[in-house]
């Protein structure tokens, strides 16, 4: 668990971890220079639970570096990642460990359902996402708080560390490149959403209506010129990252090919990228598009549409 000014909610999360039905070997908490009572609350818990190991950064590391360095401290064979403000189902770890071992996987993730006690809009989408490399190069669809992984995955992370990219995206890509990633299709995390959460973004309506489609396409095309450079920069980083893996599965080869094309904004590369996206249309979106014609059109436009991910 990594913390930063999490005093308001951390007790609920710690209680849900300590009371897991699966025995917890160690609880590593790394605080990123909190200015509230987070550290004091953790020290209270340490008095009655010696499995908790607290580390306080001398200087702020930021979310990604804080998580990566905290994960490197783990000494167990399996690691579960926790946010500071969620609430776990008490059988979360037991179920994930059982499924990961059964499937002989490097990483298992479960589903989570957002909740809030604040008056803020939520986007509740309980579809099982595409989580292959063809999707992960665009967006980290496997959130860290849902992951259980082999400790070995952390040692396999490429030396080309992407400081500006999400830690969970890097972990998911690495696990996919070296082995098997599986999803346990159960909702095991209550994922708290509040205005102070680092990852909270006000959701847009995703209802498939004519007005929403027009608004979505208009926004994507209008923002293309300002976002395409950021897409190219992002894909250059991803392409460099993927080249670090010695294995060359068909999924990795497709991800390498696509990230290479999308790192160049020339017209010919965009046409080639569109053709490849059409071929990979069942793998590149958040979830499989059931309407075949819509899938082809979305895929053909994907080199433009995906630029919205990288807007400021």
Question: Where are the predicted features?
Answer:
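C-terminal subregions of glycosyltransferases and related glycan-biosynthesis enzymes
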Residues: 164-165, 170, 177, 181, ...
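Conserved donor NDP-sugar-binding/catalytic core segment of glycosyltransferases
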Residues: 91-122
